[in-house]
Amino acid sequence: MANPITLTSLNIADHVKPGIWTKNPDAGVIAKLAPQVQFLAGTTDIYTFTETPKAELVGEGNNKGSSDYTPSTVTAKMLKFHLTYRFSDELKWADEDYRLGVLQNLADNIMVGSSRALDLAGIHGINPATGTVSNLIPDYIMKSRSGVADLDAAAAALQANGYTATGIAFDPVYAGELARTKESATSNVPLFPELGFGFGFDSFRGLRAGASNTISGSEEITRTTGALIPQAIMANWKAFQWGIIRNIPLELIETGDPDGQGDLKRKNQVAIRAEVALAFAIMDKDAFAVVTKTAA
């Protein structure tokens, strides 16, 4: 008989973390566009300077005036997410190659879920498991947000707010619509050839770009008629800072009821759980312009 599965020394970050946050097409897009920084556990207040600094010209022998500007603060709160999967306890008896294959697939899935969680919390403020806004998330991009009609209007809004765009996050359906847009009604020449068919693109009109349905939240959020649905977010993504506070370990659970689905021993099951603690902070909401449509 094969030895029972042992996960105490396995850490996802040591094996599959590099690249999966930014390259997996099913994952989120914020981690591709926004800088990752270090956050500590708990709640962190960050000083922000959103006004343009204005230096004073001082004549020889003249007194210097005060730079009359008080910084504001934003709060980054640690958020914990978990994924828990159940398997038949026969998994413990499988050969090593099979067990490692299961763990690799599970690790990939967990990292995708964690990446999507960052987007769904940071853009919509929702608990990904329920699709509803969570009071654990103090601020998010769509909070009290009005949208703009198209990308030109998004660029104009950023410019009016004194920001330069660094990237665009697309909903895949909207990206596909743009990819199929032609130069004219009688032309077959794509207006945006860099989008190809709307899959796997990394840039758009000179800006870094990515696509995920986390932008609209179409898989998680049920919207009422008239609600705003994000189609694209053009932003100076330096204003969205995020970080992983704790690596993502796998835990094998063989007893108890870890997810409310019944006793593991009674059901001849084991559970594998991964948790991630992360934080993010939005430095200035004016650094984001959101193209939206209205739910029918």
Question: What are the functions of these language-model segments?
Answer:
Residues 81-86, 274:
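Short amphipathic
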Residues 86-164, 290-296:
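Alpha-helical scaffold segments that mediate packing/assembly in large oligomeric complexes
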Residues 55, 80, 120, 124, ...:
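Cell-envelope/extracellular anchoring and linker segments
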Residues 49-50, 88, 171-173, 212, ...:
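Structured loops at beta-to-helix junctions and adjacent beta-edge loops in soluble globular domains
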Residues 2-83, 287:
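Assembly/oligomerization interface modules of large self-assembling protein complexes
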Residues 148-263:
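Extended oligomerization regions of viral-like shell subunits
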Residues 1-28, 36, 252, 258-296:
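Protruding loop/beta-arch "assembly-hinge" segments enriched in small, turn-prone residues
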Residues 55-57, 95-96, 177-180, 242, ...:
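Short helix/loop capping segments that flank catalytic or ligand/cofactor-binding pockets
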